[in-house]
């Protein structure tokens, strides 16, 4: 194998490693985003429920007052 072929092979191997690394990093970032989005959704639901409970309590208190 000539030097240019060896250089081409080394270059392709370097690029393959870089692409594999980029794919792994992208996958890890996407997985983290899915988890973060799920936690955010759960938190939003909990806050909504708490807000509704507070509003219900306030309405009940107003009804008792008048």
From Swiss-Prot:
<dbReference type="GO" id="GO:0009289">
    <property type="term" value="C:pilus"/>
</dbReference>
<keyword id="KW-0964">Secreted</keyword>
<keyword id="KW-0843">Virulence</keyword>
<comment type="similarity">
    <text>Belongs to the HrpA type 2 family.</text>
</comment>
<protein>
    <recommendedName>
        <fullName>Hrp pili protein HrpA</fullName>
    </recommendedName>
</protein>
<keyword id="KW-0281">Fimbrium</keyword>
<feature type="region of interest" description="Disordered">
    <location>
        <begin position="46"/>
        <end position="66"/>
    </location>
</feature>
<feature type="compositionally biased region" description="Polar residues">
    <location>
        <begin position="46"/>
        <end position="58"/>
    </location>
</feature>
<dbReference type="GO" id="GO:0005576">
    <property type="term" value="C:extracellular region"/>
</dbReference>
<comment type="function">
    <text>Major structure protein of the hrp pilus, which is a component of the type III secretion system (T3SS, Hrp secretion system) required for effector protein delivery, parasitism, and pathogenicity. The hrp pilus functions as a conduit for protein delivery into the host cell.</text>
</comment>
């Amino acid at each position: 194998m000539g030097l240019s072929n060896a250089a081409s092979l080394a270059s392709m191997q370097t690029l393959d490693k870089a692409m594999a690394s980029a794919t792994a990093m992208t996958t890890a970032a996407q997985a983290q985003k899915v988890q973060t989005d799920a936690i955010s959704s759960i938190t939003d639901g909990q806050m909504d429920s708490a807000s509704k409970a507070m509003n219900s309590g306030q309405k009940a208190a107003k009804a008792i007052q008048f």
